[in-house]
Design a protein with these regions (language model features):
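Flexible, glycine-rich beta-alpha linker
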Residues: 81-82, 99-103, 127-144, 201-202
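N-terminal Rossmann/SDR dinucleotide-binding element
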Residues: 1-30, 241
């Protein structure tokens, strides 16, 4: 909170508290819905928290923007599409069928569909984006990269699930935010946009989990150990952001 820029008000509350959400939404022009439980490991231990925040919370927010007629952008994930085979060249597009494989991705898929239903049924002015894996400053310690860095800083080995062959399509948080701003300013109501840093057809933002950990260990002088793989671990994510690049003129920096 100490790093918040001037003019930003931090309000701590429950995304499912309808009266609070109504009040906050009514006092603003635009809502960007980042709020979510988002760590897969946690969703395997306690799915109920994900149903509460990701589904009930999105419902509460949709009702608030419906009552106040505010513009909404809903942040989602590439994980709603499931995963792709290792070694392939195919990619997720905006028309890829949903095939979530974890409680987290299932609740995010459900929240996407709620937004689409409120757009069609109630005329809510909303857009959706599905983004690949983020990295950057101040990321929560539960996430893959800061978790490994923190382990090494505290004298523990970094931990790699299984063989580490899983592939992720990484994007810096600043590029993600720039894409969201482009959608808010130039996107079409009711549309969905994929966000990813790989150039179309190249996979140049692809890195295996093992490569990420080896790079961290090399830079920090640490070591890593293999641990049992996560149940249902997705193998590869590849995002095709052609629509976002072509229609809105966005590109990662």
């Amino acid at each position: 909170r100490a790093n918040l820029p001037e003019g930003i008000e931090f309000v701590e509350g429950d995304i499912c508290e309808q009266s609070l959400i109504d009040e906050l939404v009514a006092a603003n022009d635009t809502v960007i819905h980042f709020a979510a439980e988002s760590h897969n490991d946690n969703s395997l231990r306690d799915p109920s928290a994900f149903v509460h925040s990701n589904l009930v919370g999105t419902f509460a927010l949709l009702e608030a923007v419906r009552k106040s007629d505010k513009r909404l952008h809903h942040i989602s994930t590439d994980e709603v599409f499931g995963d792709l085979e290792l070694g392939g060249t195919d990619a997720f597009t905006e028309t890829t069928p949903y095939n979530p494989s974890s409680p987290y991705s299932a609740t995010k898929a459900g929240s996407d569909h709620l937004v689409r239903a409120w757009v069609r049924s109630f005329g809510v002015r909303a857009t959706i984006s599905n983004c690949s894996n983020n990295y950057g400053p101040y990321q929560h310690i539960e996430k893959f990269i800061p978790r490994q860095i923190t382990n090494i800083l505290t004298g523990q080995p970094a931990k790699l699930y299984g063989t580490g062959a899983q592939v992720r399509d990484w994007i810096h948080v600043d590029d993600h935010n720039d894409a969201v701003l482009a959608i808010l300013e130039r996107g079409c109501i009711g549309e969905t946009y994929n966000i990813g840093a790989s150039s179309p057809g190249s996979g140049d933002a692809h890195v295996t989990n093992k490569q990420v950990i080896e790079t961290i260990c090399e830079l920090m002088g640490g070591e890593y150990v293999h641990v049992a793989d996560r149940p249902g671990h997705d193998q590869r994510y590849t995002m095709d952001a052609t629509k976002l690049r072509r229609e809105l003129g966005w590109a990662p920096k």
